[in-house]
Amino acid sequence: MYEFLQETVANNMTTPVRSITPETTVGDLYRFFAADDFDAYPVVQDGMLVGIVSKLDALEVFAFTEDRILPRYADGMATQVNKIMSSDVVAIDPETKLQCVLQMLTKHKVKSLPVIDQRRNLVGIIAREDVMRAMKRWTLRQ
């Protein structure tokens, strides 16, 4: 077993986390994506993780389907994140081992996972890059 995979999320996660509220508009979300170059944002209300919203979620606001006509640009940009976010979020605990993180990232095909405490308060985020940094540290020690 690779030793770095036994490290915990708490020692490798990114804090503080940039998050948004459910009332954030798609227009603001696009500006945040452009400024931060993130692929997704955790959605937090009163400190608790309530969802996650991705670039794909934001793009789907303007997608034309058989069931839905194309919305006006202003209406799409005014849409609140709570209308498009995923509420069923895969999140992990700070004491989770990187081995488990690696399995979850690949199983769910996501780039990062929110880290929450027992009360669902968002305490960090762990991304593929964080796991790669841990691997690099261990590689340099060898």
State the predicted function of each range.
Residues I20-D37, V44, A91-K109, I116, ...:
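The conserved cystathionine-beta-synthase
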Residues M1-P16, S54-V90, K97, L102-T106, ...:
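Tandem CBS (Bateman) regulatory domains
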Residues F33-D36, Y41-D57, L105, L113-D130:
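A glycine-centered beta-loop-beta connector
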